[in-house]
Structure formats: structure tokens, C-alpha cells
């Protein structure tokens, strides 16, 4: 999948959140990293069609995505979303959380929706949890079910906004292992993350976003090994100094 961003800007009233963001590359898996408040989540939501830019253009595989609601609805149906908060419906079981959107949003018949959900629960070691409600599940299980729900529609692109930031370390590993497996299957993913090990080792490419702009981007392993900008060098030194 090729994604091109041309001079994307986003302002909230007088606050500049993104300023002339330009990017073009073929992606399979890409991590967006950078300090808090740099515009990472805003950029992810614009790519997903959840938020309109103040100005700029976006192209997916050479086709311009016009920022009107009719086109954005079509665009969003090809994308799976996972956010920091797990977003499961508390009054529904895990099975219902995965199955019902397939039926009511995507028009899949009930038997096919159940079959799809069961396959995902079995694949990701969640079969024993499918009849439980969210309050009966660990944070890691809830987030993995959120990811299962997002990929149940067989999206062309999966967007994840800090999916592990609210999790304990052992649950973080569960979620990252699941994402690694999906990436190995060839699912296109863009993830906003503070997990530098995952960004370096599991994502093919990386974008470093700071002060509302993309400062650096490229191959993950090379970028982490030899950052070109002082900002990224300083950021990585601060992040990695306390790592085991």
C-alpha cells in the first residue's frame, strides 16, 4: 500500500497541531513515534478519515481521498481501528463485541459473522473468553479482542493508537505478539507507539514526529541505529537510557 500526504495541516482554533506534513512511501508496517503532544494521534486519525485536516491532500495507492463525508465513509470501511482505550461495549460479551458490528455495520449474515468471530478467537487463544463480559477480562485480553474485532472485517489497513499504553508489561507482550503475527500475515499496519523495541524490530519503517512536523522517516532498523537529526538522537537517548 502506498500512502502520500501533501502539506497536511491541522489547527484546533488557534493551536497548530500539524504543520505542512509531507510523506510518501510504500508501507507494510510503520510506527509513528515522538514525544507527547507532537501530533501523532491527530495524524493517525486524519489518515483513517476520522478527522478532517485544515488543509492538504492525501492519496492512497495513487487515488486522492477527498475529505467529504460520502468518500470518507467508503474510506473508513476499508480500515480497522484500535485505540488506547479498549473500546469494548461493557454490556456485550466478547463474542457479541466482535460479531455484532459485522452484522449491523457491514451487512454480514449472522452465521458467517459467528464463524468469523470463532476463527479469530481460536487463532489468538481467546476461545475460552468469548462468552465473558469485558469486566471479566484482563486488560490484555480486552485489547486483543479489540484487535480481533478490528481485523474481522478484513481491512486493507489497520490503524492503532498507542494500544499498549494502559497495559501492564505482561499484557503489553500479549498484544505486541498478536500484532507481530498479523504483520507477518501481510496486514498493512500503522501504529502510534511508545514501545521502541516493537517500533524498531517489528515495524518495517518509522516516522518521527515532533513539534507538529515529520522530522525524520525511513527504515526502522537503520533509523534507530543511525538517526540523522539531533531531535531524534536526543529523543532516543532519553527513551532508551532506562531500558533494561
What annotation goes with each model-predicted range?
Residues 65-80, 184, 223-227:
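ABC ATPase NBD coupling module
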Residues 158-161:
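Catalytic Walker B motif of ABC-type/P-loop ATPase nucleotide-binding domains
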Residues 110-128:
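Conserved ABC ATPase "signature" region
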Residues 48:
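Helix-to-loop junction immediately C-terminal to a conserved catalytic motif
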Residues 152-156:
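A short, proline-enriched helix->beta-strand linker immediately N-terminal to the Walker B motif
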